[in-house]
């Protein structure tokens, strides 16, 4: 069952730290690594007053795409304080090597709808793919309806962070430890984790819907 998921799934990470390890592991299993980098995007790196920061996912289509991902990541974390804007993203862009996706959570749609931001990203240099999900969160349906205003054919996806629903508390504990901040103490009762209130981000949930 896990192999079935791996053959159909994509690995999306917030950094490139685990890329080489992931490539080695998939090669050992005879699988093709389909890798995406989730990164923050802002309207303008020059505008220090801009409060709009949202997530995008950039997938590498080939080896050249991996090189471009590395350049984008390096720029964002050396000159962009962890983010990139349209001007600099377009500089490294190639539709032949990269694919841009708008994730369901933490995207500009999410930020505008649920956090009253005013994000106006410029994706004119490419054609993004929009994702939707259903993880039994109270705002999933509202957000999905809003996504449909930007894209008539979004792709249904599933974020998987742990194996079984019973592993949710262990995952939550891990995230609390990783996100410790001196000024904002995290606990299981108050983990300070956005939309971390569902046990549906599991492989078990995906299998129930796809392996019947």
Indicate where each model-derived feature is located.
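Covalent nucleotidyltransferase
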Residues: 48-57, 63-72
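Solvent-exposed, non-transmembrane amphipathic alpha-helical segments
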Residues: 62, 86-89, 180, 190
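Domain-core and long-helix interface of multi-subunit machines
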Residues: 1-29, 64, 68-172
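Catalytic cores of large soluble enzymes that bind and process phosphate-bearing ligands
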Residues: 14, 58-61, 135-139, 205-212
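Phosphate/diphosphate-binding loops
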Residues: 32-45, 52-55, 155, 162-167, ...
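Cofactor-binding loop segments of dinucleotide-utilizing enzymes, especially the Rossmann-like FAD-
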Residues: 38, 61, 103
């Amino acid at each position: 069952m896990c192999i079935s998921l791996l053959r159909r799934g994509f690995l999306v990470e917030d950094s490139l730290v685990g890329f080489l390890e992931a490539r080695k592991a998939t090669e050992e299993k005879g699988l093709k690594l389909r890798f995406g980098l989730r990164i923050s995007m802002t309207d303008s790196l020059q505008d220090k007053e801009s409060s709009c920061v949202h997530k995008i996912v950039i997938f590498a289509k080939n080896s050249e795409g991996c090189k471009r991902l590395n350049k984008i990541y390096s720029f964002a974390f050396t000159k962009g304080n962890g983010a990139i804007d349209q001007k600099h993203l377009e500089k490294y862009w190639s539709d032949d090597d990269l694919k841009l996706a708008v994730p369901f959570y933490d995207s500009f749609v999410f930020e505008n709808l649920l956090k009253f931001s005013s994000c106006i990203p410029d994706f004119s240099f490419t054609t993004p793919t929009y994702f939707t999900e259903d993880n039994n969160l109270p705002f999933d349906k509202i957000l999905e309806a809003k996504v449909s205003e930007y894209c008539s054919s979004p792709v249904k996806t599933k974020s998987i962070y742990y194996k079984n629903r019973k592993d949710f508390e262990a995952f939550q504990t891990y995230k609390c430890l990783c996100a410790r901040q001196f000024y904002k103490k995290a606990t299981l009762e108050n983990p300070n984790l956005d939309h971390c209130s569902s046990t549906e981000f599991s492989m078990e949930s995906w299998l129930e819907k796809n392996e019947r």
